[in-house]
């Protein structure tokens, strides 16, 4: 599977959790899932092939140990490649492209597993004869491919992403793969049917839903030692209990309990989401930081029943948006191109709803940003050309107002 997530979505953290498990059955047990066939899952050995340069210390040792144990258990050979050797091989093929990237990844996998020169079919057959299967793990793609829009790097990334297709063609498949990759790399590599590709792997996307949002909010409270929150409670409390506990943080509503204001938890989640309902953990972390800073500057005894007042929460959102856009323009190429073009063309009038032509938004950018939840197009004909909208988490950062 391809696990797509933005920077900070938890790709490397998840990669490390899987590596620590050593086999698929143990990982499923850790995350509270039951294996359809525990015996088969136990034989699915975790084997890291590529990982991030940022993995250091104990985490790096864990990855290395998982790889060495996997090499012994799979029993395909005793020699493997180090991370630096793998990185050098990738760099060499980027310069020369002596090997088609499909062949390159096959050779790299075979050599890393200790059986250089073997095809995927041959590796699969050897695993079958030994009663084993393997889950190949790839992370840190952005460390070895720093310019995904360059043609050579695009071809390399596309081939890696499509490795799962080639593995799926094996009869009696004993080789699987988990490829952790940033969304902008998928955009750069998959030129056709991007939406179809994303849909295919949507079940594996590293995203946060409303329940995990509440659990993270409560966990952050536990780390900050406020509202009596506990680390254990972040996992064990029901959604209703979490909502009730968090009222000490931000109240029931963005006003008094009998007001017509929105419910606080729902309001924060909606303010931090994109237009597909996706939320990123780092957005909530910075929301807490900015809201706390605003609260310190403007303490109001009227809201003594909560830690964060409605005013502080409202003021935090534009600050979150500005940081969000700064990060997202580095990760999402169509957003970067559009933002830079608006600045270069000195487009000052930016209001919602808007038309693509009024803000120099090109059709291919619109398509990509719509799929990513950055732009929403309302098809109501009564709106005319001005039918495009931005979520709040992007609006202020892109300097749009609501006066349209």
Model-based region annotation:
Residues 125-126, 141-261:
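The catalytic "switch" region of P-loop NTPases
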Residues 254-404:
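C-terminal leucine-rich, beta-strand-based interaction scaffolds used for sensing/assembly
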Residues 2-135, 144-150, 154:
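P-loop NTPase nucleotide-binding core
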Residues 23, 110, 114, 158-165, ...:
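Alpha-helical repeat scaffolds in large eukaryotic proteins
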Residues 14-16, 135, 178-183, 214-217, ...:
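Short, hydrophobic, well-ordered secondary-structure elements
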Residues 52, 181-185, 381-385:
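Short beta-alpha junction loops
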Residues 1, 116-119, 158-162, 198, ...:
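Short linear interaction motifs
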